[in-house]
């Protein structure tokens, strides 16, 4: 019987200008379903975390916009992968049809008979304007806006741009990809009759923590941009709207704007913290210290045997989000659900763990005011005397609870539901940032993570005395562990959560700014 050809589909999707929160819901849905993602170098890497693990992530252009492979090669790859039955997302910075060459790819797909869909994105111009504080149209300032290429087809002998028409344009001009031609663009606009006092600005890395905005006039902006040594990607804005920046600028006022922060949580738990950092104007750098994985299959029967005896325990104690997730995964695997916990009271070490329990329909009966094992143990020693307590835990961790509870006559049993392993080394990017000082902060969320951070520094031949990266600790216990390793802790969270770490960094920066 002849095989049936199954054709996939290609989604030409806009990723927005940089901030990962600006991707559309439709594009995010397609990323989650994709078999393959081909993305531009201008795409924020955090967006790739929305894809499934089987996706091949292959950059087609570099961050500075230079080409790795030709447009023809990209077209051929899209067609070949779709013919192989794959769902392909072609992810482009900004909008696919606004100087994104998306229409060329769509035409190639149409000619080859490949189904495709175009998903608009927030344009780079829109993102740059609104994150920099420019309103391109305004009743009293500008009735029109023009998007203009600053980098035309290099194979053409003559320019298609009519600078005399642009000089007369009754509104805002936005030039894409024009930083290297900034002086020439300003010269031609002035030569065509636009006043040299016309406000102008350059926006680099729009909507990212590394965003830079330089403003001036047509006469001064080339020198100002050169003085700041601006780099692509960038846009040039020409028009009266540039004067609005003093009034409308908001992004640079965010409390963590321009601050890079190392997120040391396990990779699969880093996204929520990364989103918090982005919303505060910062740049998350995901650098997990430990890897979390399931227990070995031979150890699973012991977990199942414990589930047979859940009715024997008066208390269940959860000391991590991972412990909650893995406990309920094994519980469901055994054919049980939350009703199996009806006889026990539940203790959680912190709000994050308690919230994770709530996601499974369980309200914690007790959460200590101070999110430390010592506080949890002291409270349980009073509440659970003579009772059976099951501690759901990882293969490694602090062993404070057993001593505290057993001394109080509590019958403690430990149930290991997941493994945690140290990562082998920092990535090369993290090492480079630590050595260059471009990673400004790192958050340490447990004593074991503090010790592992110190160990990886040693492996990378970075000595604590040379480290310019500031350290924020989630608790005094974690701070002491860091101090024991020779690390200097800049601040300690009042609330022992990652939100507490970020709040501590904000407070530390404000205090430093006040004293400087």
Question: What function would you assign to each model-found segment?
Answer:
Residues 93-169, 214, 366-372, 428:
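Class I SAM-dependent methyltransferase SAM-binding "motif I" and its flanking Rossmann-like core
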Residues 155-201:
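Conserved anion/nucleotide-ligand pocket segment
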Residues 32-42, 199-204, 346-350, 470-475:
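Short internal beta-strands
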Residues 43, 151-152, 179-181, 204-209, ...:
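Glycine-rich beta-alpha junction loops
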Residues 12-14, 90-92, 119, 148-149, ...:
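Short beta-strand segments
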Residues 35-37, 57, 135, 173, ...:
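Short, well-ordered beta-strand core segments
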Residues 1-20, 25-122, 127, 227, ...:
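Class I S-adenosyl-L-methionine
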Residues 4, 18, 64, 70-74, ...:
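Signature of uroporphyrinogen-III synthase
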């Amino acid at each position: 019987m002849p095989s049936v050809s199954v054709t996939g589909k290609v989604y030409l999707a806009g990723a927005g200008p940089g901030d990962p929160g600006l991707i559309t819901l439709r594009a995010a849905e397609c990323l989650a379903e994709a078999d393959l993602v081909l993305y531009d170098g201008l795409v924020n890497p955090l967006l790739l975390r929305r894809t499934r693990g089987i996706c091949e992530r292959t950059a087609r252009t570099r961050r500075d916009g230079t080409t790795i492979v030709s447009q023809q090669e990209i077209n051929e790859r899209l067609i070949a992968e779709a013919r192989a039955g794959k769902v392909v997302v072609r992810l482009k910075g900004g909008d696919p049809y606004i100087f994104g060459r998306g229409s060329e790819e769509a035409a190639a797909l149409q000619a080859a008979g490949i189904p495709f869909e175009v998903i608009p994105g927030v344009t780079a111009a829109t993102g740059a304007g609104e994150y920099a504080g420019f309103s391109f149209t305004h009743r009293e300032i500008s009735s029109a806006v023009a998007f203009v290429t600053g980098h035309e087809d290099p194979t053409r002998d003559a320019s298609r741009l009519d600078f005399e028409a642009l000089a007369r344009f009754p509104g805002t001009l936005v030039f894409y990809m024009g930083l290297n031609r900034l002086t020439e663009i300003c010269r031609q606009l002035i030569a065509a009759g636009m006043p040299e006092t016309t406000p102008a600005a350059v926006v680099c890395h729009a909507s990212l923590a590394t965003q830079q905005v330089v403003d001036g006039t047509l006469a001064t902006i080339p020198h100002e941009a050169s003085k700041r040594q601006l780099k692509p990607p960038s846009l040039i804005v020409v028009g009266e709207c540039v004067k609005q920046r003093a009034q409308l600028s908001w992004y640079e006022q965010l409390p963590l704007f321009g601050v890079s922060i190392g997120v040391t949580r396990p990779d699969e738990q880093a996204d929520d913290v990364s989103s918090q950092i982005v919303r505060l104007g910062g740049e998350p750098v995901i650098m997990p210290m430990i890897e979390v994985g399931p227990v070995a299959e031979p150890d699973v029967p012991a977990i199942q045997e414990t589930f047979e005896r859940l009715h024997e325990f008066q208390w269940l104690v959860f000391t991590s989000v991972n412990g909650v997730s893995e406990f309920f995964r094994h519980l469901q695997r055994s054919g049980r659900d939350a009703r199996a916990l009806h006889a026990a009271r539940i203790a959680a070490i912190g709000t994050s763990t308690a919230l994770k329990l709530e996601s499974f329909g369980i309200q914690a009966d007790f959460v200590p005011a101070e999110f430390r094992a010592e506080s949890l143990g002291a409270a349980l020693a009073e509440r659970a005397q003579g009772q059976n307590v099951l501690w759901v835990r990882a293969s490694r961790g602090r062993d404070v609870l057993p001593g505290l509870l057993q001394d109080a006559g509590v019958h403690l049993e430990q149930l290991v539901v997941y493994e945690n392993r140290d990562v082998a080394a920092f990535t090369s990017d993290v090492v480079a940032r630590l050595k260059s000082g471009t990673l400004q902060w790192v958050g340490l969320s447990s004593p074991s993570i503090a010790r592992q951070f110190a160990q990886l520094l040693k492996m990378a031949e970075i000595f604590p005395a040379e480290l310019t990266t500031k350290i924020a600790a989630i608790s005094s216990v974690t701070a002491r562990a860091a101090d024991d390793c020779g690390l200097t802790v800049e601040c300690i969270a009042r609330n022992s959560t990652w939100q507490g770490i970020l709040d501590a960094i904000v407070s530390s920066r404000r205090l430093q700014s006040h004293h400087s």
